Every structure is written in structure tokens, then in C-alpha cells.
């Protein structure tokens, strides 16, 4: 099962990816992890990427696609894989096709922007333990204090409303077009066309998980 998971930041993709990978016995492939591993291993592509990153540049699609091609050829991908955070752009999706890497299904987790903002901007964290609360959905017993230690809770920079809205803006501009790209391809059909599965991500994690797994197993 070769899969792509789409959805805005905060939609719960990481949680669902773990469930999918466990159910199908496939690895979760993150471009960030892949880059770090290639740099650490000192591969030719890793050395190119390190030079660019050291200079503060963005690693090109050609290098990313080269790393993807190497990664999916490894033994643990024999039964498939799940791409996490890839492709991010139409150009990367086209590159994947050009390499002949076939995708069986694309799963889109749908969550409205305002729900994402509420989820993320309401998070509060205890720095010492990593315990996470939510001002509405999972509040601490005493406002702003950790239940166990009584120490102050903080809002992470990534969870501030302006940061969340900026990330959503980037998603809609760069990654959201992939929804049209893959859903239209699935509608047209053809031998290589992936299935396109949409799920409502506003429901409980277990409900979303069960619906995704049922849809994938029904293929």
C-alpha cells in the first residue's frame, strides 16, 4: 500500500499516519528525517543537501526526489510506504510521476481553518514534562497551572494564533492545490490513478482512524 496523507497542519495527520503504518506494516517516510539521515550518512545527495542547508538555502526538488527514489527502493518499502509531508507542491507530485513511483491511495483529512485555530491556539504545555492541555477541551484543574506540579503552563510559539494562521496560509497556497491534483486524477481514472479518500477530521481520533483503515482495506 503506497500512500500519501494530505490535510492542513493540526488536522491530526501524524496520529493517523502512525495508525495506518502499524495496520499495514509500512514505513512512514518524512522528507525531514530522510534529509537528516542522508546528511549523517554522508551520501552524495546528503552532501549536496548539507552544503545548501549550511548556506541557509532550500533543498531543491531534484535532491528531494533523488532521496525519495533511494528511500522507496529500500527493503522495508517492499509492501509500500506512507509519505509524510510529501509532496508539498504540484512540481514535486509531477516529479514523483516522472520517476514512475506509483501511489495507490491519497487520504485527505478535512478540518476547517477555524477548527484548526481553535485546536492549536488553545494548547498549553508544561515545559518540564511535555504534558499537553487545552483551554477548552482538556483544561487543567487550575487555570494556567500543571495538574501534577502546579507549575506554569506555556503556549508554544508554533501554537500562537498568528503563527497558526500563517501556516494555514502557506498550506492553502502551496499544498492545497494537491487536493485538486489528486482528486481530479482519481476521477479521471486510468491504470495508474490513485484512489482518493476524504475523511472528516473533526470527529474523535478513533472514529477517523477506523474510517481511514476501512476505506483502505476495501480497496
Curated annotation (Swiss-Prot):
Residues 128-150 are annotated as: Disordered. Pfam families: ADK, ADK_lid. It catalyses: AMP + ATP = 2 ADP. The keyword Transferase applies. Keywords: ATP-binding, Cytoplasm, Kinase, Nucleotide biosynthesis, Nucleotide-binding, Transferase. Pathway: Purine metabolism; AMP biosynthesis via salvage pathway; AMP from ADP: step 1/1. Signal peptide: none annotated. It is found in: Cytoplasm. InterPro entries: Adenyl_kin_sub (IPR006259), Adenylat/UMP-CMP_kin (IPR000850), Adenylat_kinase_CS (IPR033690), Adenylate_kinase_lid-dom (IPR007862), P-loop_NTPase (IPR027417). One of its GO terms (cellular component) is cytoplasm. GO terms for molecular function: adenylate kinase activity; ATP binding. It comes from the Bacteria. Belongs to the adenylate kinase family. Catalyzes the reversible transfer of the terminal phosphate group between ATP and AMP. Plays an important role in cellular energy homeostasis and in adenine nucleotide metabolism. This is Adenylate kinase.
Amino acid at each position: 500500500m503506497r500512500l500519501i496523507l494530505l490535510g492542513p497542519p493540526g488536522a491530526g495527520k501524524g496520529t493517523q499516519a502512525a495508525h495506518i503504518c502499524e495496520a499495514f506494516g509500512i514505513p512512514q517516510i518524512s522528507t525531514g528525517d530522510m534529509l537528516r539521515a542522508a546528511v549523517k550518512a554522508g551520501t552524495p545527495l546528503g552532501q549536496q543537501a548539507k552544503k545548501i542547508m549550511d548556506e541557509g538555502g532550500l533543498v531543491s526538488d531534484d535532491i528531494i526526489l533523488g532521496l525519495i527514489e533511494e528511500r522507496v527502493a529500500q527493503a522495508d518499502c517492499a509492501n509500500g510506504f506512507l509519505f509524510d509531508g510529501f509532496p508539498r507542491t504540484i512540481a514535486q507530485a509531477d516529479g514523483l510521476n516522472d520517476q514512475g513511483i506509483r501511489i495507490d491511495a491519497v487520504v485527505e483529512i478535512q478540518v476547517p481553518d477555524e477548527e484548526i485555530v481553535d485546536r492549536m491556539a488553545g494548547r498549553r504545555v508544561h515545559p518540564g514534562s511535555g504534558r499537553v492541555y487545552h483551554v477548552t477541551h482538556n483544561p487543567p484543574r487550575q487555570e494556567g497551572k500543571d495538574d501534577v506540579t502546579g507549575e506554569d503552563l506555556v503556549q508554544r510559539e508554533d501554537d500562537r494564533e498568528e503563527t497558526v494562521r500563517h501556516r494555514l496560509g502557506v498550506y492553502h497556497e502551496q499544498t492545497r492545490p494537491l487536493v485538486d491534483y489528486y482528486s481530479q486524477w482519481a476521477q479521471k481514472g486510468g491504470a495508474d490513478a490513485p484512489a482518493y479518500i476524504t475523511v472528516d477530521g473533526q470527529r474523535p481520533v478513533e472514529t477517523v482512524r477506523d474510517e481511514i483503515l476501512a476505506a483502505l482495506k476495501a480497496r
